[in-house]
């Protein structure tokens, strides 16, 4: 595979391929340029980090094989392999800080601390596979060596560019042997695709690894016509095919040919134009008329990676659910019912018998479509699991993010993957927002072997709508979207979004602020309400700095930075709101005598622009047109 040299000045100026030395020999990888003692420290730090990141038995073979390959990659003596294996098994973890200090004192790393990141990335990608656990390790090592994680994004992009320039020559014998093997694999691939068509598409892409060559059309889709012409070598074809999926089509090439079980619609829609070594899939929770009638609308500000998709699923039923929500918005016009509802929520009384009669009278409006979507979201999640397990997306890390029923899709996707072999190394991070799923730790325990990076549970303690749909079982059931998941694991991060999300519908309306709150990068120029700002509307003091801050997000992605769940009192996050807007109640734990917010006052009801009734639940189409302060119950 291609190798690039350590940069002299800035990262974008470094060469993409190895430069020959004066004698015509290729330049050695930067990791091998370190002294033997520092190469030992480099490998030892990787071993210790692996043991801390992946202590589960399911990951032991990966850690052992990774360290064996790294020892060989760094040309260390085989005598050190037992020591490195011991480090990867959890022995000697107290020496991590010592190894970090040794590496930071190395003259090469003093000039350019990205050397280790660059070398470890090259090693992780040398076989055309980018395991999610390897990327988590690279991120962790990058943070330990005090290198901004944005530098890793630059290096990954440069590696992708370097693949365009691979021009490895093949001998006639090697070429003939390769073509013979490819013909066999081609027929096998055609057979599998035929079976997939009969089976409804569940095994499409099963040969997304090295089994199929990258066709010219697929290569042009990824890197353009000029770049495709440069990928004529076996190494370039193998790496690109393995990383980006069968025939280069990736997720955009997947289309469910036939109905699978209860699923009627399942397809991936691109959110971005580029390609990246790691991808993000966003899952929307419902559709509504107006601004949120498309699957991509809530994710306009998402910038977690250069290659992002949204899952389009069961639009008919999600639209019915959205219409049901709007019906409830129009039906709860009575101010007495509104005040009673607010008082009920503020008092923390959410048992079925305490819900206002006016709300219970229209319960069937929401219960029926909600129940249908609950069932279908579980089926869609299981189908998504098989798509990811078949490597339709290629062999690269995947981040999943979803809100409401979209988070439920991801939850059942992880459940299904956990039951299959070889489920490790595919999923990097998952972000579940307002998830209508079980919150008991025992149900989340299997996710530890599936997710390599972070498991973020974003919840709102004052989400009355989620409480209402679970009103008959909320006493026995812990709902993840209402409270933290008490699983003691370095992956799990519970983020209390009560100060950002005033109700369930805000998960779509406040997505930009939510993404920043959970540490996901967003595009610059988006305000807290998810509205695109004009160039002159950024803060006048330091507009460029503000844009940069918005682009990188408020919280950098550091693997394992949160140990266990965050308590509800310490994880409240500030939300920038309109100065005229009344303070939103922070949750259900307030005292019995808590006063009602200003929005509940009969003198100043928020009037819905539908022209019919007040808007107590925050209609997404007219929330920006309400008169007077409106904390709402959306």
From Swiss-Prot:
Chief place of localization: membrane
Keyword Transmembrane annotated:
yes
Q: Which UniProt keywords apply?
A: Coiled coil, Membrane, Transmembrane, Transmembrane helix
GO annotation, cellular component aspect = membrane
> Where found in the cell?
Membrane
InterPro entries, alphabetically?
A: AB_hydrolase_fold, DUF726
**Which residue ranges have biased composition labelled Polar residues?**
552-583
Q: How does it sit in the membrane?
A: Multi-pass membrane protein
Region (Disordered): which ranges?
542-612
Q: Which spans of this chain does the record mark as coiled coil?
A: 150-190
Membrane-spanning segments:
203-223, 231-251, 346-366
Presence of keyword Transport: no
Write out the similarity annotation. Answer: Belongs to the TMCO4 family.
The name under which this protein is listed is Transmembrane and coiled-coil domain-containing protein 4
């Amino acid at each position: 595979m291609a190798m690039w040299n350590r940069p002299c000045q800035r990262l974008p100026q470094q060469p993409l391929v190895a430069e020959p030395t004066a004698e015509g020999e290729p330049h050695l990888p930067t990791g091998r340029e370190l002294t033997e003692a520092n190469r030992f420290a480099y490998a030892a730090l990787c071993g210790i980090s692996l043991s801390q990141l992946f202590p589960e038995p399911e990951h032991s073979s990966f850690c052992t094989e990774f360290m064996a390959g790294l020892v060989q990659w760094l040309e260390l003596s085989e005598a050190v392999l037992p020591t490195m294996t011991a480090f990867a098994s959890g022995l000697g973890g107290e020496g991590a800080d010592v190894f970090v200090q040794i590496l930071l004192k190395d003259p090469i790393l003093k000039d350019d601390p990205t050397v280790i990141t660059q070398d470890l990335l090259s090693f992780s990608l040398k076989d055309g596979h980018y395991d999610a656990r390897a990327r988590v390790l690279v991120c962790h090592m990058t943070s330990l060596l005090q290198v901004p994680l944005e530098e890793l994004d630059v290096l990954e992009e440069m590696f992708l560019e370097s693949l365009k320039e691979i021009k490895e020559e093949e001998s006639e014998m090697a070429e003939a042997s390769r073509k013979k093997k490819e013909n066999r694999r081609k027929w096998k691939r055609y057979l599998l695709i035929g079976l997939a068509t009969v089976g409804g598409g569940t095994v499409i892409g099963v040969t997304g690894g090295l089994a199929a060559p990258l066709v010219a059309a697929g290569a042009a889709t990824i890197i353009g016509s000029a770049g495709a012409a440069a990928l004529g070598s076996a190494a370039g074809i193998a790496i690109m095919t393995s990383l980006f999926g069968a025939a280069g089509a990736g997720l955009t090439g997947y289309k469910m040919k036939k109905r699978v079980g209860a699923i009627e619609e399942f397809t991936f829609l691109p959110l971005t134009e580029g390609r990246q070594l790691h991808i993000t899939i966003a899952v929307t929770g419902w559709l509504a008329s107006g601004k949120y009638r498309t699957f991509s609308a809530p994710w306009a500000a998402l910038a977690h990676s250069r290659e992002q998709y949204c899952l389009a699923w069961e639009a008919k039923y999600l639209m019915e659910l959205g219409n049901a929500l709007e019906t409830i918005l129009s039906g709860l016009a009575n101010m007495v019912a509104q005040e009673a509802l607010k008082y009920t929520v503020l008092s923390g009384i959410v048992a079925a018998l305490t819900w206002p009669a006016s709300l219970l009278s229209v319960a069937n409006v929401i219960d029926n479509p909600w129940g249908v979507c609950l069932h279908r979201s579980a089926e869609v999640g299981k189908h998504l699991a098989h798509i990811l397990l078949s490597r339709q997306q290629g062999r690269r890390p995947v981040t999943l993010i979803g809100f409401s029923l979209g988070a439920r899709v991801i939850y059942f996707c992880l459940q299904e993957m956990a039951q299959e072999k070889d489920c490790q190394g595919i999923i990097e991070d998952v972000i579940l927002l307002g998830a209508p799923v079980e919150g008991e730790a025992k149900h989340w325990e299997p996710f530890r072997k599936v997710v390599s990076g972070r498991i973020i549970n974003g919840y709102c303690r004052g989400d009355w709508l989620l409480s209402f749909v679970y009103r008959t079982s909320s006493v026995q059931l812990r709902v993840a979207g209402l409270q933290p998941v008490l699983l003691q694991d370095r992956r799990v991060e519970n983020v209390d979004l009560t100060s950002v999300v005033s109700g369930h519908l805000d998960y779509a309306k406040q997505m930009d602020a939510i993404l920043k709150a959970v540490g996901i990068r967003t595009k610059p120029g988006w305000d807290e309400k998810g509205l695109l700002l004009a160039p002159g509307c950024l803060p006048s003091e330091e507009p460029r700095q503000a844009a940069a801050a918005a682009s990188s997000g408020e919280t950098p992605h550091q693997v394992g930075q949160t140990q266990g769940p965050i308590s509800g009192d310490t994880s409240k996050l500030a939300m920038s709101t309109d100065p005229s807007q009344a303070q939103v109640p922070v949750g259900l734990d307030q005292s019995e005598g808590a006063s009602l917010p200003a929005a509940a006052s009969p003198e100043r009801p928020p009037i819905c622009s539908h022209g019919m009734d007040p808007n107590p639940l925050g209609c997404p189409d007219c929330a920006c047109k309400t008169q007077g302060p409106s904390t709402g119950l959306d």
